[in-house]
Curated annotation (Swiss-Prot):
Major localization listed first in the record, in broad terms: cytoplasm
Secretion signal, residue range per the UniProt entry: none
Organism field: Brucella anthropi (strain ATCC 49188 / DSM 6882 / CCUG 24695 / JCM 21032 / LMG 3331 / NBRC 15819 / NCTC 12168 / Alc 37) (Ochrobactrum anthropi)
Protein's UniProt name: 2,3,4,5-tetrahydropyridine-2,6-dicarboxylate N-succinyltransferase
Parts forming coiled coils: none
Amino acid sequence: MTKPDLASLEKTIDKAFDERDGINTATRGEVREAVEQSLVLLDRGEARVAEKQADGNWQVNQWLKKAVLLSFRLNPMEVIKGGPGQSSWWDKVPSKFDGWTANEFEKAGFRAVPNCIVRHSAYIAPNAILMPSFVNLGAYVDEGTMVDTWATVGSCAQIGKNVHLSGGVGIGGVLEPMQAGPTIIEDNCFIGARSEVVEGCIVREGSVLGMGVFIGKSTKIVDRATGEVFYGEVPPYSVVVAGTMPGKNVPGENWGPSLYCAVIVKRVDEKTRSKTSINELLRD
């Protein structure tokens, strides 16, 4: 789709979102067509909610988030087939794989293990592997990435190339508030088992999060070597583990509860990262 076509689509979506109180399952015409077209573009990876710019910053295409939100108003609940034991689900969003045959899977080029769930409008790039996991609408999973068992990729989350999301990892979805950016995991990152990255935080390229690291917008991310504290973003090629920081003393006492933080235990360059095992990086 050309830039003028995208601009026209964006204009229609923006206007419809401003007038969303009047949009419902009976709405037809230009608005419905624009929303459906937007979701197809997301599903094919021809458009994405956020795009990395040359300066390293991420540009968020808020109109595509609006299209996703409008789809909830437009689409009625319906039976979704494919449940265990020939049962069904009851939802507004069909499976990405609805109606797929071997031909569609071969063209898509990724591996979808039984019991993985991907909702329509999420993009999965070639050579990705989906274990029994959940990928929500509007998300983008790039080439060579492994989404391991029971991992969750939230709505509109952006997952880079050659990322490993270990078992039980949660990557938070961000649809609202509208001004919030999506959660982003850049290329060549490793996210350890049962870790959570949420609230539009960014894990920059080449970083390693150990098992059980939780990062939200208010989480202190402390560089042990410098004392520098980051919020909402893990710097590139950081090795991060769960830790604690001293808290304030309780009234009348000389002690207080420690508070959770994430600790950058080391930083490595790209060459070291590519040649060193994850276990070696985390051993300190």
